[in-house]
């Protein structure tokens, strides 16, 4: 996993290089390409993951698993339509926890289960509020398009400061109880500084793409392939892609239809993030279950 993280850091600096050479429009196009490939791909094999988890516990019928999964996605879509403020709030919370869990789970910090979950959520919220505070105009526009609620910069600032304070308390607590993690914490603080630079100089979509793909999706793909097939190599990765391909294509077709119906940028961004949210809810639950299962399987 450390090699994967190092690759992600190198790719992030390559993303900064793109920012310095190309226009904002190019960043947006490239960002969507990355999201529609690696980003969608990393969440396209949830059904297979559920099957792998079931194989290790109790086998669940495929149609039952698929029905529950689609019902969860459908419920998220309906919630976004009728209760957009609630849906967006839940999306941010689920995404924050999901990002934090993926980023920290492999570190083996030996924290209590409750503290770990709180820390994952707070770290993920810190990343998201950093993204929001450094791209306020675009964020305010997208939130207004989704919810018809108009935020201002102060709302984003207060959310960031509150999250930063909570993160500081968590880090201090970890260092007091587990001083052996000092090098890990210092490295993570440096990586957060890198994110600040990336988010500051990039457009919202490109900044989100860099984090979502290089820092989240690629490490997640590694974890998923290793969990399903027991190893990560060229053969297992292609098996993963082959299994994910039908779900990936369906997702792309859905996004393409939405784009051709709503070509207005703001509306499309709103629908795009709503779509990401709809698949995030079940995906986050599946990944949490995967990590829980790995803890009970020493060979994983």
Where are these regions (language model features)?
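N-terminal membrane topogenic signal
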Residues: 1-11, 62, 242
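Hydrophobic, membrane-inserted alpha-helices
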Residues: 11-17, 68-77, 189-198, 255
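Short, hydrophobic transmembrane alpha-helix segments
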Residues: 15-29, 261-265
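Membrane-interface helix-loop-helix junctions at boundaries between adjacent transmembrane segments
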Residues: 55-62, 74-133, 141-151
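Alpha-helical transmembrane segments of multi-pass integral membrane proteins
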Residues: 93-97, 102, 118-138, 157-173, ...
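Membrane-water interface signatures at transmembrane helix termini and the short loops
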Residues: 183-223
């Amino acid at each position: 996993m450390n090699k994967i993280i190092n690759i992600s850091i190198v790719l992030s600096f390559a993303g900064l290089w793109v920012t310095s050479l190309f226009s904002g429009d190019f960043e947006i196009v490239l960002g969507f390409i990355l999201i529609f490939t690696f980003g969608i791909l990393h969440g396209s094999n949830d059904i297979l993951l559920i099957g792998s988890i079931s194989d290790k516990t109790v086998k669940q019928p495929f149609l039952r698993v698929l029905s529950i999964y689609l019902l969860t996605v459908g419920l998220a879509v309906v919630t976004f339509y009728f209760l957009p403020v609630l849906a967006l709030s839940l999306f941010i919370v689920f995404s924050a926890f999901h990002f934090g869990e993926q980023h920290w789970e492999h570190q083996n910090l030996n924290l209590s289960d409750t503290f770990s979950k709180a820390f994952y959520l707070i770290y993920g919220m810190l990343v998201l509020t950093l993204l929001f505070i450094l791209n306020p105009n675009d964020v305010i526009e997208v939130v207004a398009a989704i919810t018809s609620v108009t935020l201002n910069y102060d709302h984003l600032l207060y959310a960031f400061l509150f999250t930063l304070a909570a993160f500081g308390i968590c880090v201090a607590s970890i260092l007091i109880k587990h001083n052996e993690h000092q090098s890990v914490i210092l490295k993570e603080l440096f990586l957060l500084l890198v994110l600040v630079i990336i988010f500051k100089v990039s457009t919202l979509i490109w900044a989100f793409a860099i984090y979502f793909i290089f820092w989240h999706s690629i490490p997640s793909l590694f974890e998923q392939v290793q969990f399903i097939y027991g190893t990560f190599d060229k053969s297992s990765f292609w098996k993963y892609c082959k299994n994910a391909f039908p779900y990936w294509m369906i997702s792309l077709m859905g996004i393409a239809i939405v784009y051709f119906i709503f070509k207005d940028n703001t509306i499309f961004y709103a629908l795009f993030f709503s779509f990401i949210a709809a698949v995030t809810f079940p995906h986050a639950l599946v990944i949490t279950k995967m990590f829980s299962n790995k803890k009970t399987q020493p060979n994983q």
